A protein has these predicted regions:
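Dinucleotide-binding Rossmann-like beta1-alpha1 core, especially the glycine-rich loop
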Residues: 1-24, 186-187
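Mid-domain beta-loop-alpha active-site segment that forms a flexible
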Residues: 43-61, 107-108, 178-185, 235, ...
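Short, conserved active-site loop motifs that form the nucleotide-linked donor/cofactor pocket
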Residues: 67-69, 159, 225
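Short loop/edge segments at beta-strand edges and connector loops
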Residues: 23-24, 72-74, 200
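Helical element adjacent to the flavin cofactor pocket in flavoenzyme catalytic cores
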Residues: 6, 10, 34-100
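Conserved beta-strand segments of alpha/beta enzyme cores
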Residues: 18-20, 69, 119, 197
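C-terminal catalytic lobe of FAD-dependent flavoproteins
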Residues: 15, 52, 146-147, 171-173, ...
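Active-site substrate-recognition segment that forms the wall
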Residues: 76-87, 94-223
Length: 270
């Protein structure tokens, strides 16, 4: 518990985010889904959870109502540049022009950075999840078990385990061994860590950077091109702040947060 207490102290000191420390004997009273004998936990009562697929669907619907147009199954082939900016991007559905261009293509950003004249050493970090019916004794809270690097998310209609970090390129397979390993990871902590019914497996590629910081800011030498990628394992958490920073830059305003640590040009200087 000492290591986690140090993390809690840092979060309290730097961000005014503190947790309630719960010793082992109290855990089962807090959440009966937990096994007896655990050392303890830190409860961050302001934390919450969401289903990313539903959030993205809702974003899409709301943006379309505001006039945003989504062009799907469209491959970006190249970018035509003028003196100090991008004139248009050439796609499989024809040229597209805009006042500003933002490269926000997640784990694929390393393959597309050259369009903006950027060196982006972003690697795909593959993770897995399995979503299944809720167990009879289901956790009441979303939980992280750092020793086994597994996250537990209880939904109204289901229950999800997520974990893993593999550097295997853009591999699209979901090995059954990984799914079983994921299920086993929660067994030391939960009375009913998984259920038998119909389950849904998933994989995704996280955009990993070698210094664990995202790349947010102008593309070097281009007045109308910006980068917003490389958020590692915190893309959803950092999305709102990233959007505000990029919007401020495009509008010619100073962002509220110092963007220099996230400068995409740092990779070229390394």
């Amino acid at each position: 518990m000492a290591d986690f207490a140090a993390t809690d102290q840092l979060l309290t000191r730097e961000f005014n985010v503190s947790a309630r420390r719960i010793e082992g004997p109290e855990l089962c009273s807090l959440d009966p889904s937990l096994k007896p004998g655990l050392a303890g936990a830190f409860l961050y009562e302001t934390d919450t959870m969401l289903r990313p697929e539903r959030l993205c669907r809702e974003w899409r619907e709301r943006l379309m109502c505001r006039g945003v147009r989504f062009v799907e199954s469209c491959e970006v082939l190249s970018a035509e540049k003028e003196a100090d900016g991008i004139e248009c991007v050439i796609t499989s559905k024809g040229p597209m022009t805009a006042d500003g261009y933002v490269l926000a293509t997640g784990a694929r950003s390393g393959q597309l950075g050259h369009l903006f004249g950027c060196y982006l050493p972003i690697q795909p970090g593959k993770g897995y999840s399995v979503t299944m019916p809720r167990p009879a004794i289901c956790p009441s809270y979303p939980m992280l078990f750092p020793e086994h690097r597994v996250g537990v998310t209880p939904f109204q209609e289901g229950y999800r385990l997520g974990s893993m970090m593999e550097f295997v390129g853009f591999d699209e397979q979901i090995p059954s061994s990984r799914v079983e390993q994921l299920k086993r990871s929660a067994e030391p902590y939960l009375k009913q860590p998984h259920t038998d019914g119909q389950s849904e497996t998933w994989y995704g590629w996280r955009p990993m950077t070698w210094d664990s910081l995202p790349a947010i800011g102008p593309a070097s030498g281009l007045r109308n091109a910006y980068v917003a990628t490389g958020h590692n394992m915190l893309g959803l958490s950092m999305a709102p702040a990233t959007g505000k920073m990029i919007a401020a830059m495009i509008a010619g305003k100073g962002p509220e947060l110092d963007p220099s640590p996230f400068d995409p040009a740092r990779f070229a200087r390394a």
